[in-house]
C-alpha cells in the first residue's frame, strides 16, 4: 500500500486502532514477555545465490541461539533449510569482478571465487584466519585483509601483498649517541662487525627486490605508533595506514561486578571509561609505497577550518587555554565511519576525516604521487556531525565520487567529478543505504519521501534526474541488487510482521513475498493496529509523529487513563511502519488497551528519520525538548482521545528511562507514575562517544551536564517511580541507578522502588526477567492510574 493513499485514513480523527475480537484470546503478560520464538523468527539477513535463481537467508533456530541458513527460489516454491552438505557450495554476499565474469566471497573466514558462467567454485584460502575487505582490481586480481596484513591473488597464486609494522626499519638511522660513536671510532672490530651486518642486510634486500617470487618487505611505521587500520589499493601499489601514539591513554576503565556466575564467586569484567576522562586519541594518516617501503605522512594542514575552534567560547568560559594548532582528528576505519574507499583501478582513494570535537567531517582524496590530501567536501555542524549518513564511494568510471551529507538539513546524495558537484536527491526526507548499479548509471537507495515513517527502495540516475519509488512496502529494512542487476531482494517488515523477504523488479512494480516466518499462533491474534498520528507541537516543532493505541469505539463521556511510552537510544525511530525494536512493548500496549488505557508512543525531538534539526534539538540540553513534546502529546490525548489528564503515566528504557526520570523530577504532578528502565540518571557516568557529541566534554561544558542529568533534579520527585536495571549492564552501568538510589534516600523520598536483575545486561534476554519487569510496570500503573 502507498502511504499517500492511506494518509487520510491513517491520520483521520477517528482511531483506526481496534480492540481485540472477543473470540480471539487476549494476549497475556506471560505470552507478551515470553521467549519470542513463539512469534516466529525474523529474517536476519539475506543475499542472492550466485546465479540469481534463489535467495539465502538466516533464521534463528527455535529454542537455541543458532542461526540456520535457508534458501527460497525466486520463481516460487517452499523455502528449504540448507543442509550441512549444501553449505559447502553456498556463496555468501559477494563482490563481482568489474567485467562481471567472476564473484568473490568470504565463508568461514576463507576466500572463494566463483566463475559466473560455469558456476565453478575455487577456494583460495583454507586456514583459521578471518579474511575481510575483498576487492577486485581491473586486471582480474583480488586483494583482502587478514589482521594487519594484506594478501593478493593474481589468478595463479595467493601471496602476501603488504605487511605494515609498528617498528623501526632495519636500516633506520639510530638516534645520535656520542658514546656509541666513540666506541665505533676506538674499537675497529666493533666497526667491522657493524659494517658486515649492514652489508649482509643490504645484499639480502637487493636479492629480495630482484626476485619477483618474493613478497614485498614489511612497511615500517616506527616503534612510537600503534597501527589502527590500513587500506591497500586494488593494484597493490599503495597502502594507507592509520596510526595513533603508542601507549595513548584511553582513560581509566571500569571494573563491573558480575554477581551470579558459574564459578560461584563474584567476578569482574573490564568495562568502558566515562565521558571526558580522556578524549579519543588523535590519529595520523600515512601513505606507503609498497614496492619500496617508502612512507610519507599525509599532512592535515590543508583541511579548511582545521585550526578553527568551534568550542572557543566554552573553552574560555571554563578557564581553559585556547586551542593551539590543528584540531585533533580521527580517520574513518569502518567502525562508526566507513574505511577508505579505493576506485577499482587503484588510481583514486577517498577518506573520511572527523574532528575529535565532533563538529567537522572532511571528505578528502589523496594525491598519490605527491603524498598530499585534496579536500573535496567539508561538513560542519554547530551541534554535532551525525554518526549516520557518512557513506561514500566511487562509481565504476574511477573518477566520480558519491557521498551522503546532511548539509541541506536532511541526508542527501551528492556526486563529485573533478570540481563539478551534483546533488542527486533533495527534499525534506532522508537518503540512506546507497548502492550504485554495476554500470554506474543509477543509484539505488532507501528513502522516506512519502512520509517520514514510510521507507521504500528508490532510485535516481547518477547524472541527476527524477527520483522513483520502486517499492510500495512501507517498511523496507534493506535490499540487495541481483547479480544481473535486474531485480531487488528486499527485506521488509510491518507493525506485526517481523522482517521478511520479497522480490521486486529493479524497474519497480508489484512485489512478490518470498517468506512468512510467523507462527500460526501469532497470526491468529487480532492485534491492535497502531494509528500513525501527527501531534501538533506548541513549542515550534511543527508536528510530532507517533503511534496511538486505543479502543476502536471509545465509550462516550469516559475518560481513559494514559500511558506514554518513550523509546530508547534518543536517535532511533519507533513511530515508523517497520516491525518495532520494541515488539514486546507493542504487545504490552495491546494488553494495556484491553485493561482500559490509551497509549501514545512518540518520536520526540532527537529521534531518527526527521532531519538534522530534529536530531540536534537536544544539543547541550537533553530532556528539555523531549519533555515538551510529551506534554504536547498529553494535551493531544486529552483533547482528541478522551484522555484523563489526572491519571497519566510514562515509561521507557535506556534513553526512555532517562526521560521518565526527567518527566517525574522536572514536571512533578504531570505523570502520576513512571517506570524508568535501565535509565541514565547522570550523563557524567555515560560513555564518551555518545555523550560528548551532544553535551560536549564535561570539563568544557559542565552546565550542559548539570541541566541534562536527572539526578540533579531528584528533589522534584513526588509521584510514584519504579527503577528497573540489569546488574551486568555494560552500557548504562547499574551503578548509575545505585547512585540515584542513594540520592533519593538522602532526600527522604518515598513512593519509589528499585528492581535489580542480577543476570541481565542492557537488553534483557531471559523471559523470566522480562515478565518480572513488566509485571511490576503493570502493577505500578494499575495501582496509581486507576484510583
What are these regions (language model features)?
Residues 5-13, 19-478, 486-487, 495-499, ...:
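Beta-propeller folds
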Residues 3-4, 614:
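Extended, C-terminal/distal alpha-helical "rod" segments
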Residues 17, 55-56, 150, 376, ...:
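Intrinsically disordered, low-complexity N-terminal regions enriched in serine/proline/glycine
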Residues 476-787:
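Serine-hydrolase catalytic core recognition
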